[in-house]
Amino acid sequence: MEPVTDATVYVVDDDADVREALAWLLRSRRLLSECYRSAEDFEAGVLKLPPVVRRPSCLLLDMRMTGMSGLSLFNRMLERGEIAAMPVIFLTGHADVPTAVDTVKRGAFDFCEKPFSDNALVDRIAQALA
């Protein structure tokens, strides 16, 4: 089955079960995805590429992770001006909602509170890639 778009949805979450579930969901909706277990791995694997080499994309980013947090990665991306080219959708637990709202005010595309609706998340991804 061919992907519906040539864009890539990057998933950065330190929980292997979440990464696996999101990869399955995206595959079932014919969306290309790449999963990373840490912000550091994502930064080394994707953000080191020149922007002209990268595919159109969006980023599903866990707010809290071991090592570099999703918030720290977002702040680094803001400093480098990478948010406009790669919309960020934060995945957050209930306690992080005020922080997630603040990130949207600062340039994140949106946030989804865990547990999230598959359809709502896919709709947000489609909007981010439009």
Model-flagged regions — what are they?
Residues 2, 16-36:
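Two-component/phosphorelay signaling modules centered on CheY-like receiver
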Residues 19, 66, 75, 92, ...:
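The feature encodes the CheY-like receiver
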Residues 35-58:
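Acidic, metal-coordinating helix/loop segments flanking the phosphotransfer/catalytic sites
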Residues 37-38, 69-75:
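Acidic catalytic/metal-coordinating carboxylates
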Residues 54-57, 81-87:
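His-Asp phosphorelay/catalytic-motif detector in bacterial-type signaling
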Residues 96-98, 112-126:
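C-terminal output helix
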